[in-house]
A protein has these predicted regions:
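Local sequence-structure signature of Cys/Sec-based thiol-disulfide redox active-site neighborhoods
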Residues: 1-30
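Thioredoxin-like thiol-disulfide oxidoreductase module
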Residues: 35-53, 79-87
């Protein structure tokens, strides 16, 4: 798996994934987008390490932040900026 500061594991045609990417872009965060569509090995490793089968999965500094609902909640509360600023 990638070790960029912010990494989003997603699928190209996933509506929730597009929403999560838009949030990160709107906040001005640089991130690495990794398409897991068709990569069964990577998908299996993500499930093994996170226990989650759905995407998007957003990592910050190699640690799982969560999925779309988590990013939306962090953005609403203002904690997303604090979390990212503490890492970047």
């Amino acid at each position: 798996m990638y070790q960029e500061e912010i990494v989003i594991y997603a699928r190209t045609r996933c509506r929730q994934c597009r929403r999560a990417r838009r949030i990160l872009k709107r906040r001005g965060y640089a991130f690495e987008a990794v398409d897991v569509g068709g990569d069964e090995e990577l998908s299996a490793r993500l499930v093994e390490t996170t226990g989650k089968k759905e995407v998007p999965l957003i990592f910050l500094g190699g640690r799982l932040v969560g999925g779309l609902a988590d990013i939306e909640a962090l953005e609403r509360s203002g904690d997303l900026d604090r979390l990212v600023r503490g890492r970047v």
